[in-house]
Amino acid sequence: NFDYIHNMCKNISSNINIIKYDYNNINRNTYNSILSSKLFWEKLYGDKILIYQEDSFIFRDNIEEFLEYDYVGAPWVLSDVSEYWLPKKVDYNKLDIMVGNGGLSLRTRKCMLDVISTIKNTHSNFHIFTKKINYYKDKIIAEDIYFSRSMIMYNIGIVAPKNIAMKFSIENTYYKNPFGGHQFWKSMK
């Protein structure tokens, strides 16, 4: 897969940098560890990084509309994340910031590094381990929750508000004419 992707991207642009890790296959916990690591973000070039998982699609050519934000991803459904994913220090019921699905997300590299140097991605900082740890056996929380919630908790950069995030990407809830989607078919149910 690496050789195929590397050759394809080389033919598209010399500005695309493919980084190969020494993993044959990764699970959710490994993926979250990689993306939550300083090493990963230091290997990347540029100010803005588009995370594009293979189950994502880009529908429109309007990414410029979102460059002012340091983190933007599809909005989450509050009931899906409320008691499991929210940091202890913030009352999200009072805020319109349930944003951050990472499968298709645009991020400022420096802000990701600032989060990593400010707070560790451990269960003690989040509620996730109260009920889901026995089911998932995750050692750390999902990287998208770690970054977007930590940015808000520690005032690092600007996380896009929900009304902007829904124009950027869809996943569980349908919004008209987004930039793209991550597992967007979930919104068709």
Language model features: what each stretch is:
Residues I18-K20, Y71, I158:
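Conserved beta-strand scaffold positions in the cores of enzyme catalytic domains, especially
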Residues G46, Y69, Y154-G157:
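Short, high-confidence coil segments that cap the C-terminus of an alpha-helix
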Residues I97-K189:
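Catalytic core and acceptor-binding pocket of nucleotide-sugar-dependent glycosyltransferases
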Residues S56-Y92:
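Conserved donor-nucleotide/metal-binding helix-loop-beta segment in metal-dependent transferases, i.e.
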Residues G46-I58:
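Short beta-strand-to-loop acidic/aromatic patch adjacent to the donor-nucleotide binding site
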Residues K43-Y45, E64-L67, R107:
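Short, conserved loop/helix-junction motifs that constitute active-site signature segments
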